[in-house]
From Swiss-Prot:
GO CC annotations on file: cytosolic large ribosomal subunit
InterPro entries documented for this protein: Ribosomal_uL22 (IPR001063), Ribosomal_uL22_bac/chlpt-type (IPR005727), Ribosomal_uL22_bac/org-type (IPR047867), Ribosomal_uL22_sf (IPR036394)
Function description: This protein binds specifically to 23S rRNA; its binding is stimulated by other ribosomal proteins, e.g. L4, L17, and L20. It is important during the early stages of 50S assembly. It makes multiple contacts with different domains of the 23S rRNA in the assembled 50S subunit and ribosome.
Protein name (Swiss-Prot/TrEMBL): Large ribosomal subunit protein uL22
CDD domains in the cross-refs: Ribosomal_L22 (cd00336)
PANTHER family assigned: CHLOROPLAST 50S RIBOSOMAL PROTEIN L22-RELATED, LARGE RIBOSOMAL SUBUNIT PROTEIN UL22M
Cysteine pairings via disulfide bonds: none
Keyword Ribonucleoprotein tagged: yes
Assembly description: Part of the 50S ribosomal subunit.
Domain of life: Bacteria
Length: 137
């Protein structure tokens, strides 16, 4: 490996140390309903985002809360010497993409059938540390 390539790889590795992510695949909720909850926590600090999700009455908020806790644990595993409160973690990015669709048929009048689409989604949460983000800018 060349010197330049090694330097860029090390720089990328250091940049990735300040972020952590978690993924939830094939969650049996429609993407539209999940995006309503995801928009509430996008850009929020982690503590505030957890409170928003805990006190939300939507079913999607329970799944997002578990995913956010998983992302926090991933960050703690990456940064064993770092302190969670001092790092100032926030929800840097949250993506809700459409997942697999189960297609079912429901009988309709006059011998026809209507297609029922049971939608699912994929959610990705990326956490970033405020201290590192501001020092790099």
């Amino acid at each position: 490996m060349g010197v330049r390539k090694r330097e860029t790889a090390d720089a990328r590795k250091e940049a990735n140390k300040s972020i952590a992510f978690a993924k939830l695949n094939n969650c049996p909720t429609s993407p539209r309903k999940m995006r309503l909850v995801a928009d509430l926590v996008r850009g929020q600090k982690v503590e505030r985002a957890l409170n928003i999700l805990r006190f939300s009455s939507k079913e999607a908020s329970r799944k997002l809360e578990k995913l956010l806790l998983s992302a926090i644990n991933n960050w703690e595993q990456k940064n064993s010497e770092g302190n969670l409160e001092e790092a100032g973690l926030f929800v840097k990015e949250i993506r809700v993409d459409g997942g697999m669709m189960l297609k079912r048929l429901r009988p309709a009048p006059q011998g026809r059938a209507h297609r029922i689409r049971k939608r699912s989604n994929h959610v990705t949460i990326v956490l970033g540390a405020i201290n590192n983000t501001q020092s790099n800018s």
